[in-house]
């Protein structure tokens, strides 16, 4: 894995009136990184992700993507430049099939936009890319099924496939196993583990088994500030991290190293 920094947040601050939601947060992702962001409920993880993706403007601080300042770019422009976030299922087109959905996303990413509706099945390159993603995410058996009829685990796989259709340099993977039944988790976890090595991944997840099996580095956020950063082994053995999780009565405490 290269040590080149792909995504960098420097001194990020976000205030809502008199409330400080993030406090001078620094975060760096290297090329091909497998990095996890963890913290108890209310730690500021969602605010930080919204800052990185442009949903919220920072009160102070700077965000760079491959050395370019993106602090004030729109979410759409950040996606175009390669910073992509997975979105939860209610933002998918429930009446569309996975094949239609991925063909639409691929078409839009390639600048074809609305022409997709009149060209479905006619663009071989778009179709091939959509079918490749369906194969990669083991969705071939439901490719012609309405999304609303798919098992929940398959829908979560489709969310990740949609993000990869945007050809990200950095993928923000937002709680991929949340709500997934136990019987559907294994396939999802295997797919997450097999994400392309050239894509830097920031995982936001409460499932500590997934976090510790996936991440090569971890950042712990508490009360809007970075408590510590390190390898999974360093995080697991840090008494401050354990105290924070036990103090917040998390359903899954940090595993012992």
What does each of the following model-derived ranges do?
Residues 2-257:
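Glycine-rich phosphate-binding loops of nucleotide-dependent enzymes
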């Amino acid at each position: 894995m290269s040590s080149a920094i792909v995504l960098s947040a420097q001194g990020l601050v976000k205030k809502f009136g008199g409330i400080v939601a993030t406090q001078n947060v620094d975060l760096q992702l290297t090329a091909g990184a497998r990095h996890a962001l963890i913290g108890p409920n209310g730690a500021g993880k969602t605010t930080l992700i919204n800052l990185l993706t442009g949903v919220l403007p920072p009160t102070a601080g700077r965000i760079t993507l491959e050395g370019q300042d993106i602090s004030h770019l729109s979410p759409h422009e950040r996606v175009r430049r390669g910073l992509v976030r997975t979105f939860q299922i209610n933002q998918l087109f429930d009446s569309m099939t996975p094949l239609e959905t991925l063909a639409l996303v691929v078409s839009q990413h390639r600048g074809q936009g609305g022409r997709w509706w009149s060209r479905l099945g006619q663009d071989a390159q778009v179709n091939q890319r959509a079918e490749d993603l369906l194969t990669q995410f083991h969705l071939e058996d439901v490719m012609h099924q309405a999304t609303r009829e798919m098992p929940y685990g398959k829908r979560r796989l489709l969310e990740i496939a949609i993000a990869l259709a945007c050809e990200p340099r950095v993928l923000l993977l937002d709680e991929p196993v949340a709500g997934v039944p136990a019987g559907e988790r294994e396939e999802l976890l295997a797919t997450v583990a097999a994400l392309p090595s050239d894509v830097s991944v920031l995982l936001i997840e409460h499932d500590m088994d997934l976090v510790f099996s996936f991440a090569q580095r971890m950042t712990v956020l508490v009360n809007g500030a970075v408590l510590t950063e390190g390898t999974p082994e360093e995080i697991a053995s840090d008494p401050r991290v354990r105290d924070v999780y036990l103090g917040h009565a998390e359903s899954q405490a940090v595993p012992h190293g």
